[in-house]
């Protein structure tokens, strides 16, 4: 069953309530995240009312760099893609469609986006997921250093940016829903780093 709930009035109400507090500031991801949190609230209300579990949709790549909204798209009781990198999600989707076409092709071929702002795509602020997932595998699963990763041909600037994002978003991952483990070093119980004191390895 597919249903649509219009969230415009709810998002507008939040923004109106925050107008005085946000005076003399420019719109940024704060306002964008309100949309995700409104959706999360509605999904959890439906879950509560009908005794169903909400599935969190975040994958390992997004969880690694914090491309998820706490109490928004991270809400849910189980995260089936939690340990699956984005590039593998695409491959699994394409494979599933060889059995029967249930995933719209546009979902697989369009540029990935959080869809919280017009014309927004993930690659505005991230490298391609092919690059990101390779860095992620080397840093998290193989436990390579920044120097070892750059020796594989990756830009030092990009590697520093991605590894820094991974470390800074430990606090988000601690609050994420549980999910299956398929890798040699999954986020959660296996890989836990400090969240405070400006920790740097």
Predicted regions and their residues:
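ATP/NTP-dependent adenylation/nucleotidyl-transfer catalytic domains that generate, transfer
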Residues: 1-201
């Amino acid at each position: 069953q597919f249903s649509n709930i219009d969230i415009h009035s709810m998002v507008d109400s939040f923004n109106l309530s925050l107008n005085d507090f946000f005076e003399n500031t420019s719109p940024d991801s704060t306002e964008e995240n309100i949309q995700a949190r409104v959706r999360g609230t509605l999904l959890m209300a439906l879950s509560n009312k009908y005794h169903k579990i909400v599935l969190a949709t975040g994958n390992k790549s997004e969880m690694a760099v914090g491309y998820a909204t706490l109490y928004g798209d991270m809400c849910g009781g189980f995260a089936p893609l939690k340990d699956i990198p984005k590039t593998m999600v695409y491959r699994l989707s394409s494979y599933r469609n060889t059995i029967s076409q249930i995933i719209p092709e546009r979902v697989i071929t369009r540029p990935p986006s959080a869809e919280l702002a017009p014309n927004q795509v993930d690659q505005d602020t991230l490298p391609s997921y092919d690059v990101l997932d390779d860095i992620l595998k080397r840093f998290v699963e193989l436990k390579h250093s920044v120097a070892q990763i750059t020796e594989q041909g990756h830009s030092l600037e990009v590697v520093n940016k991605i590894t820094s994002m991974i470390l800074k978003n430990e606090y988000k991952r601690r609050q994420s829903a549980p999910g299956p483990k398929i890798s040699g070093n999954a986020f959660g119980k296996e890989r836990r780093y400090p969240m405070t004191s400006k920790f740097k390895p």
